[in-house]
């Protein structure tokens, strides 16, 4: 069994790690709700609610592929490795797949997760997905960093000319698993375990505010592709 760990890659199309997981066997997916970590990063309530709404859409898409989406809660990313290990042990996971994220806390989170899983003979596959090139991989002939942007740009363009990144399709539907997907909370307060609310004394006004944000920022891959067209 393979496990895909969704983070900021809440999509099924052109998802490198999800594609890798599905190509190696039956796959389940997991998402970690970490309210205290989000607050440390000063993520706004409207941003967290966007994630919540996108997860609902994603869960429906995954259901069409027979990939159950599990929701787990922990306060911060320091708790993520243990939480993921428990999921892996519960479902006899052979390898966890995720797409690389490059923030300071993100890199420490992933390193700790890799270390813990490897101690239990569970693989950790971190894929290049959000960038065209792995950070630090564009170097001079003397293996140094470029000091002139024009030269750096030419090397990047040459590499893209030689081989453009492949656009990956959504995974094909797999055989149905005897694993139930977790429900996703229908409001921000419950989703964040009380960590986020609109802080509005007038709840009617608060509901109008969140509805307005949802209208201006619709979720779903179809809307995103339409805006990019």
Model feature map: region roles:
Residues 1-164, 168:
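Trp/Phe/Arg-rich N-terminal binding region typifying the photolyase-homology
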Residues 145, 150-229:
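Glycine/tryptophan-enriched, flexible segments
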